[in-house]
Amino acid sequence: MRNKKVELLAPAGNAEAFYGAVHAGADAIYLGGNRFGARAYAENFSEDELVDCIRYAHLLGRKVYLTVNTLVKESEFSELYEYLMPYYRAGLDGVIIQDMGVFAFIRDAFPQMELHGSTQMTITGEYGAEFLQKQGACRVVPARELSLEAVSYTHLTLPTNSRV
């Protein structure tokens, strides 16, 4: 039987939205830092702000997920490692990822980190979702183009430890 507990996951584009989501009852908050996020021109969080958010959320039993949802060039992987390390040390709960190479890199470099497949990975069905789960993803955010019926079908076909 599937776990029926729902995680209320809220976005936060700035500190005010983060604290608002935490105090409104979100179980988890996802946000972008100042690098490797699709919202490059958004306000986003500085390194210190993000570390403070992680620590604050954990004091209240909440989780924080960081978006790393851009394509990363081969020459940028050492920068990605340095970028993620302070958040990993602070206890970042997971990373929402677009690029399969980034997915494999983070899986290997940060083995305790939860990996989530971003909607930008364009997973459209059970084969893609199952493949990603076998690679270590604990959550798959399906492609935006899918109908609710297609998402429900994919959810029902996956192993019980997967989340869609």
Task: Please tell me what each predicted stretch does.
Residues 47-65, 106-112, 156:
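Alpha-helix-loop-beta-strand connector modules within alpha/beta enzyme cores
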Residues 4-6, 26-27, 60-64, 92-93, ...:
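Short, well-ordered coil/turn segments that N-cap beta-strands
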Residues 154-160:
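Conserved small/polar residues in nucleotide/adenosyl-binding loops
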Residues 8-11, 29-31, 64-68, 95-97, ...:
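Hydrophobic faces of well-ordered beta-strands that scaffold small-molecule active sites
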Residues 2, 7-28:
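N-terminal basic/disordered segments at the start of proteins
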Residues 21, 99, 132:
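Conserved, mostly hydrophobic/aromatic
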Residues 30-49, 68-74:
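Glycine-rich, proline-tolerant flexible connector loops at the mouths of alpha/beta enzymes
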Residues 41-51, 100-109, 145-153:
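Active-site-adjacent beta->alpha loops and helix N-cap segments on the catalytic face
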